[in-house]
Amino acid sequence: GKRDIKGIAGCWSNEGYFNYVVDKLCADITKNKASIAYYCTADIIPRCECEQCTRNPDKSARWWNYYARIIKSVRKRIPNVRFAGIAYQEFREIPNVPVKYLEYVEYCHYNRCYFHPLDNGACEMNVNSMKEFRKWGEKAPLSFYGYEFDVFKQPMYLPLWNVFADEMKVYRKMGLKRVKTEYP
């Protein structure tokens, strides 16, 4: 693909852009003495739609293949760094490719109902959400990234203690490696 310098998302099939990303990530890992790295694309940004980038129609697979390639390149320079990922945006869909080289994948649960308990079999939204979440567990070790506070900004946080208690029970049974909320 052709890199558009003015563009934000970058062309994932462009070697110059790929090398820029790897160099930047290596510099950040070294500067911060990170033992685990977590790289994600910018939020709500159109992706490159050139012929090479769209060769695979599965948008989620495009990201996970690209990320695996980044990880392999970074580890050539920094062999012991570990990586995590996030199932979010267009790459939250379960990809048609293996998800490789990760300690865990954080699943962004923005498709759940906060009124009903997470494992409530009568809530169709949560049944579908948990089905997808569990399927992700077949791709990589699971983690959770919550949006419980996403609609509010300081000082308007609304504590959802019953939601947190319910989630922790479910996630503990599932053996999740990590749980994180967007805020605070």
Model features per residue range: what roles?
Residues 1-184:
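Catalytic-core regions of glycoside hydrolase
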